[in-house]
């Protein structure tokens, strides 16, 4: 493993530890409890893990491991009713018939995560990839590569 890749993996591991130790569920009963946290990494051709399972108050964070590529986590618009909050900002916004995340780059220090807990169930989503790592730069509405994955909320 190159030094650059080792440094990136170390940073991701440290960020994951900080996020999982600092995230709380908020709200009334059980306020202050640590939310179960899952990290999903993606690159040009793979999502790891493709299926992630979290408890009802859990959360997911996405990390882009593909240099020079922008990724967008994309949910169908009908997922909005499954969220425990009405506003999916700042991480997701509605665009047509989908909710699309902020762009996720390999160099971006901000993370994209679920804005609030999802109801129990299984939710498919896509990761749209664009950028020079896949060829020419293109618009977010025209992904050059689409990866598919799933979240299972227990």
Regions found by a protein language model. Give the residues of each.
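Extracellular/periplasmic metallocenter environments
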Residues: 95-154
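C-terminal motif of bacterial Sec signal peptides marking the signal peptidase cleavage site
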Residues: 17-20
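N-terminal edge beta-strand
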Residues: 30-61
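Beta-strand cores of secreted/periplasmic/IMS beta-sandwich domains, seen most often
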Residues: 50-75, 110-117
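Bacterial N-terminal signal peptides that target proteins for export
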Residues: 1-11
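Bacterial signal peptide processing site
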Residues: 22-25
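Solvent-exposed coil/turn segments that connect beta secondary-structure elements
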Residues: 67, 77-79, 130-132
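Short aromatic-acidic-glycine turn motif
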Residues: 79-90
């Amino acid at each position: 493993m190159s030094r650059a890749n080792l440094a990136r993996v170390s940073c991701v591991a440290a960020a994951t530890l900080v996020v999982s130790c600092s995230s709380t569920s908020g709200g009334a009963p059980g306020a202050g409890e640590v939310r179960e946290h899952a990290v999903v990494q993606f690159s040009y051709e793979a999502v790891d893990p493709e299926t992630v399972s979290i408890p009802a108050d859990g959360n997911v964070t996405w990390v882009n491991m593909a240099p020079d590529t922008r990724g967008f986590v994309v949910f169908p618009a009908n997922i909005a009713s499954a969220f425990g909050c009405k506003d999916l900002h700042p991480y997701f916004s509605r665009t047509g018939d989908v909710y699309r995340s902020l762009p996720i780059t390999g160099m971006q220090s901000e993370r994209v995560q679920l804005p609030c807990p999802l109801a129990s169930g299984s939710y498919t989503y896509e990761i749209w990839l664009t950028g020079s790592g896949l060829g020419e730069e293109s618009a977010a509405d025209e992904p050059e590569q689409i990866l598919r994955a799933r979240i299972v909320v227990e």
